[in-house]
Design a protein with these regions (language model features):
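Membrane-helix and juxtamembrane interface regions of eukaryotic multi-pass membrane proteins
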Residues: 1-64, 210
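Membrane-helix exit/interface motif
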Residues: 4, 38-47, 66-81, 113-116
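Helix-coil boundary and interhelical linker segments in multi-pass alpha-helical membrane proteins
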Residues: 3-28, 68-98, 161-171
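Hydrophobic transmembrane alpha-helices
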Residues: 63, 77, 85-210
Length: 210
């Protein structure tokens, strides 16, 4: 009986816990994303006069705390069936490579989007001259109203691919997709209502589709 329980536990470790490589990569990418967002907030973005709801602000903190907790909870180092670090290896799988490439694409384009949005409120010298909303052009704005939200979804899809064996992370992905899609749709409808000359070919979330 005990041996069966142990075997089941080892199967759980194999199928439902991410490898040490996957966890290190995911935490590194989370760190890169956090530092870039911090830089954008303080040195790139030009915010409007609107204020964020305190509840939304708290949810943002809880999201990052919860996401990191899920990554660590699904790491092999939290399994007591073997000594921590005994089986540590660093070898990239196909899904991890795909995830890294997708993350890089989304990460770079999300930053480009932030720059485009900030420049809408600056003059040629870089001075802020307005906080009004304008129609953005260039980059992924050719296809989407809020490409930074689509990039956010792609970033979490990339992390899900990297942490594929961590079954808990799929719930983080579903949470991100649901709230980002909702926000993207609301933004898109607002732009269509606000600007009569808004480009009709732009979509909310997925180019050419929706």
């Amino acid at each position: 009986m005990i041996s069966r329980i142990f075997k089941c536990k080892r199967l759980f470790v194999f199928f439902f816990l991410a490898s040490s490589t996957a966890v290190i990569i995911a935490l590194t990418l989370f760190t890169l994303q956090s530092f870039r967002r911090f830089y954008e907030t303080w040195f790139v973005s030009v915010f409007s006069e609107g204020k964020i709801n305190a509840t939304h602000y708290l949810v943002g903190f809880l999201h990052y705390w919860g996401s990191i907790t899920v990554v660590l909870a699904g790491a092999t180092g939290f399994d007591r069936s073997r000594p921590v670090g005994k089986d540590f290896t660093f070898s990239l799988s196909f899904l991890e490579i795909v995830g890294i490439v997708l993350f890089a694409y989304a990460w770079i384009n999300q930053y480009k989007t932030a720059i485009i949005l900030a420049n809408l409120r600056k003059d040629s010298s870089g001075n802020v001259v307005t906080v009004q909303h304008k129609i953005a052009h260039g980059g992924l704005f050719k296809y989407l109203s809020s490409p930074h939200l689509t990039c956010e979804i792609l970033i979490y899809i990339s992390l899900w691919l990297i942490l594929f064996n961590n079954y808990m992370f799929q719930y983080v992905l579903l949470w991100v997709v649901s709230n980002q899609v909702e926000t993207a749709l609301l933004n898109h409808w607002w732009y269509l209502k606000r600007f009569k000359n808004y480009p009709k070919e732009r979509k909310a979330v997925l180019p050419f589709v929706i």
